[in-house]
C-alpha cells in the first residue's frame, strides 16, 4: 500500500514536470490568467443599473399620489379678483400766474421784459417784444419778425417765413426761418444757420450747416457739415469741394482686413487638417511597423520548417508570447524548398498566451525536489 501511494505521488509530480509544449502548463497558466481577469475586471454596471432602477421605483412609490394623477387632467379654477376701476389722472401741474413776461395768446403782442429777464414768446402772427440789455430776445411767432436783441445777447430765432432780427454787438446772429435770409451777424460772430444753402455775409466766417451740400461763399472758409455724409474739404478751397472718398478707402481697408482674417482662418484650418493627417499617417505607420515581424526571426524559422512549408499558414514559432508564422506565396508554390527565400513568403506576427514566467519555473523546481525526497527516503 505504501509503495502504491508513492507511485501515485511520483506519477503526478512527473506529469507536472512535463514541458510546456505538452499542454499541461499552458492550460494551468491559462487558468491563472482567466482567474485574474475574472477577479480584476469586475463589471459594476449591472449593480449600478440595479441601484438606479431600485431608487427610481422607490422614489416613484413614495412620491406618487393616485388622487393627484386622477385630478391632474382637470383644469383648476382660479379665483377671479375684482378689478377696481382706476381713477382718471388729474393734471396736477401748476399753471404759472399771468404776470410780467408771461406768454400771450395767439394774435396778441408779447409784453416787454425787464432788464436782465428774457422776453416772453409772442403768439402766432404777433411781433415779439424787445428784450432788455443782457437778456436774449424771445422767439417770434410764425409769420412775424423777431425782435432785436439787447447788447451782448443773442438774437431770437425768427418764425417760419420771417427774417431774423439783427444781433447785438458781440452776439451770434439768430438762425433764419425756412425760406428767409439769415440776419447779419455782429462784429466777430459766426453767421447763423441758413436754409437752402444761402451764403454767409462777410469774409473770414465759418460756414454754417447747409442742406444739400452747397458751398459757402467767400475765400478762406472751412466747409460746414453737408448732407449725404460727404467729408469736408480742407481750408483755402473755394466752393467747399468735397475731399476724396474717405469712406471708400475705409471700406476697401475693411474689406482687405476681413479678407485677411478669412484667409488666416482658412490657413489655420488647413494647418490643423495637415497636422491631423500627419498624426493619422504616423499611427498607421506605427501599426504597420508593429505587425512586421523581425527579419532575423523569419529567417531562423524558415530554416526550421523549410521542408514542410506550403501555401497554408504554418504554426506559430513560439508556444507563448509573440512569434511569427509564414506561408508560401502563390507564385512560389512550385519552388523547391532549397530555393525559398524571404521574398517568396508571406509573414505575420502571431500572439500566443502569455508565458507563466517565474511562477512556472518555481513550481516545477518544487515538484522536482518533492519527487527526489520521496524517492530517496523510500
UniProtKB/Swiss-Prot annotation:
<feature type="repeat" description="2-3">
    <location>
        <begin position="225"/>
        <end position="240"/>
    </location>
</feature>
<dbReference type="GO" id="GO:0005886">
    <property type="term" value="C:plasma membrane"/>
</dbReference>
<feature type="domain" description="TSP type-1">
    <location>
        <begin position="304"/>
        <end position="356"/>
    </location>
</feature>
<feature type="region of interest" description="6 X 16 AA approximate tandem repeats of N-R-A-G-G-Q-P-A-A-G-G-N-Q-A-G-G">
    <location>
        <begin position="193"/>
        <end position="268"/>
    </location>
</feature>
<feature type="propeptide" description="Removed in mature form">
    <location>
        <begin position="356"/>
        <end position="378"/>
    </location>
</feature>
<feature type="repeat" description="1-5">
    <location>
        <begin position="130"/>
        <end position="138"/>
    </location>
</feature>
<keyword id="KW-1003">Cell membrane</keyword>
<feature type="signal peptide">
    <location>
        <begin position="1"/>
        <end position="22"/>
    </location>
</feature>
<feature type="repeat" description="1-6">
    <location>
        <begin position="139"/>
        <end position="147"/>
    </location>
</feature>
<keyword id="KW-0677">Repeat</keyword>
<feature type="repeat" description="2-4; approximate; truncated">
    <location>
        <begin position="241"/>
        <end position="251"/>
    </location>
</feature>
<keyword id="KW-0732">Signal</keyword>
<feature type="compositionally biased region" description="Basic and acidic residues">
    <location>
        <begin position="65"/>
        <end position="93"/>
    </location>
</feature>
<dbReference type="GO" id="GO:0098552">
    <property type="term" value="C:side of membrane"/>
</dbReference>
<feature type="repeat" description="1-4">
    <location>
        <begin position="121"/>
        <end position="129"/>
    </location>
</feature>
<comment type="function">
    <text>Essential sporozoite protein. In the mosquito vector, required for sporozoite development in the oocyst, migration through the vector hemolymph and entry into the vector salivary glands. In the vertebrate host, required for sporozoite migration through the host dermis and infection of host hepatocytes. Binds to highly sulfated heparan sulfate proteoglycans (HSPGs) on the surface of host hepatocytes.</text>
</comment>
<dbReference type="GO" id="GO:0009986">
    <property type="term" value="C:cell surface"/>
</dbReference>
<feature type="repeat" description="1-3">
    <location>
        <begin position="112"/>
        <end position="120"/>
    </location>
</feature>
<feature type="repeat" description="2-1">
    <location>
        <begin position="193"/>
        <end position="208"/>
    </location>
</feature>
<feature type="repeat" description="1-10">
    <location>
        <begin position="175"/>
        <end position="183"/>
    </location>
</feature>
<feature type="region of interest" description="11 X 9 AA tandem repeats of P-[AE]-G-D-G-A-P-A-[AG]">
    <location>
        <begin position="97"/>
        <end position="191"/>
    </location>
</feature>
<dbReference type="GO" id="GO:0005737">
    <property type="term" value="C:cytoplasm"/>
</dbReference>
<keyword id="KW-0748">Sporozoite</keyword>
<dbReference type="InterPro" id="IPR003067">
    <property type="entry name" value="Crcmsprzoite"/>
</dbReference>
<feature type="region of interest" description="Region I; contains the proteolytic cleavage site">
    <location>
        <begin position="92"/>
        <end position="96"/>
    </location>
</feature>
<feature type="repeat" description="1-7">
    <location>
        <begin position="148"/>
        <end position="156"/>
    </location>
</feature>
<feature type="repeat" description="2-6; approximate; truncated">
    <location>
        <begin position="261"/>
        <end position="268"/>
    </location>
</feature>
<keyword id="KW-0336">GPI-anchor</keyword>
<keyword id="KW-0963">Cytoplasm</keyword>
<feature type="repeat" description="1-9">
    <location>
        <begin position="166"/>
        <end position="174"/>
    </location>
</feature>
<feature type="lipid moiety-binding region" description="GPI-anchor amidated cysteine">
    <location>
        <position position="355"/>
    </location>
</feature>
<feature type="disulfide bond">
    <location>
        <begin position="320"/>
        <end position="355"/>
    </location>
</feature>
<comment type="similarity">
    <text>Belongs to the plasmodium circumsporozoite protein family.</text>
</comment>
<feature type="repeat" description="1-1; truncated">
    <location>
        <begin position="97"/>
        <end position="102"/>
    </location>
</feature>
<feature type="compositionally biased region" description="Gly residues">
    <location>
        <begin position="274"/>
        <end position="283"/>
    </location>
</feature>
<feature type="compositionally biased region" description="Low complexity">
    <location>
        <begin position="228"/>
        <end position="251"/>
    </location>
</feature>
<keyword id="KW-0472">Membrane</keyword>
<feature type="repeat" description="1-11">
    <location>
        <begin position="184"/>
        <end position="191"/>
    </location>
</feature>
<dbReference type="InterPro" id="IPR036383">
    <property type="entry name" value="TSP1_rpt_sf"/>
</dbReference>
<feature type="region of interest" description="Required for the binding to heparan sulfate proteoglycans (HSPGs) on the surface of host hepatocytes">
    <location>
        <begin position="81"/>
        <end position="89"/>
    </location>
</feature>
<feature type="repeat" description="2-5; approximate; truncated">
    <location>
        <begin position="252"/>
        <end position="260"/>
    </location>
</feature>
<dbReference type="Pfam" id="PF00090">
    <property type="entry name" value="TSP_1"/>
</dbReference>
Amino acid at each position: 500500500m505504501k509503495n502504491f501511494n508513492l507511485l501515485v505521488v511520483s506519477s503526478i509530480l512527473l506529469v507536472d514536470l512535463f514541458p510546456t509544449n505538452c499542454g499541461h502548463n499552458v492550460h494551468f497558466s491559462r487558468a491563472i490568467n482567466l482567474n485574474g481577469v475574472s477577479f480584476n475586471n469586475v463589471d459594476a454596471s449591472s449593480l449600478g443599473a440595479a441601484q438606479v432602477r431600485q431608487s427610481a421605483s422607490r422614489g416613484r412609490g413614495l412620491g406618487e399620489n393616485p388622487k393627484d394623477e386622477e385630478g391632474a387632467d382637470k383644469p383648476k379654477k382660479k379665483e377671479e379678483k375684482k378689478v377696481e376701476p382706476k381713477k382718471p389722472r388729474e393734471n396736477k401741474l401748476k399753471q404759472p400766474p399771468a404776470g410780467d413776461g408771461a406768454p400771450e395768446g395767439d394774435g396778441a403782442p408779447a409784453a416787454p421784459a425787464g432788464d436782465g429777464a428774457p422776453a416772453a414768446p409772442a403768439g402766432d402772427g404777433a411781433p415779439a417784444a424787445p428784450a432788455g440789455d443782457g437778456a436774449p430776445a424771445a422767439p417770434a411767432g410764425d409769420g412775424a419778425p423777431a425782435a432785436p436783441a439787447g447788447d451782448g445777447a443773442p438774437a431770437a430765432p425768427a418764425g417760419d417765413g420771417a427774417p431774423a432780427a439783427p444781433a447785438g454787438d458781440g452776439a451770434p446772429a439768430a438762425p433764419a426761418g425756412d425760406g428767409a435770409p439769415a440776419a447779419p451777424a455782429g462784429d466777430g460772430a459766426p453767421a447763423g444757420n441758413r436754409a437752402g444753402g444761402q451764403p454767409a455775409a462777410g469774409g473770414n466766417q465759418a460756414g454754417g450747416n447747409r442742406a444739400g451740400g452747397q458751398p459757402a461763399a467767400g475765400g478762406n472758409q472751412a466747409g460746414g457739415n453737408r448732407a449725404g455724409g460727404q467729408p469736408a474739404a480742407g481750408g483755402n478751397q473755394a466752393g467747399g469741394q468735397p475731399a476724396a472718398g474717405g469712406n471708400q478707402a475705409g471700406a476697401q481697408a475693411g474689406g482687405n482686413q476681413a479678407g485677411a482674417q478669412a484667409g488666416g482662418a482658412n490657413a489655420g484650418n488647413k494647418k490643423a487638417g495637415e497636422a491631423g493627417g500627419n498624426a493619422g499617417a504616423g499611427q498607421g505607420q506605427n501599426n504597420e511597423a508593429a505587425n512586421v515581424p523581425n527579419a532575423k526571426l523569419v529567417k531562423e524559422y524558415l530554416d526550421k520548417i523549410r521542408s514542410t512549408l506550403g501555401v497554408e499558414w504554418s504554426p506559430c514559432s513560439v508556444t507563448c508570447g509573440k512569434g511569427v508564422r509564414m506561408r508560401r506565396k502563390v507564385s512560389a508554390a512550385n519552388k523547391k524548398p532549397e530555393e525559398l527565400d524571404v521574398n517568396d513568403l508571406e509573414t505575420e506576427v502571431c500572439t500566443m498566451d502569455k508565458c507563466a514566467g517565474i511562477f512556472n519555473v518555481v513550481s516545477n523546481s518544487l515538484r522536482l525536489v518533492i519527487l527526489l525526497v520521496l524517492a530517496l527516503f523510500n
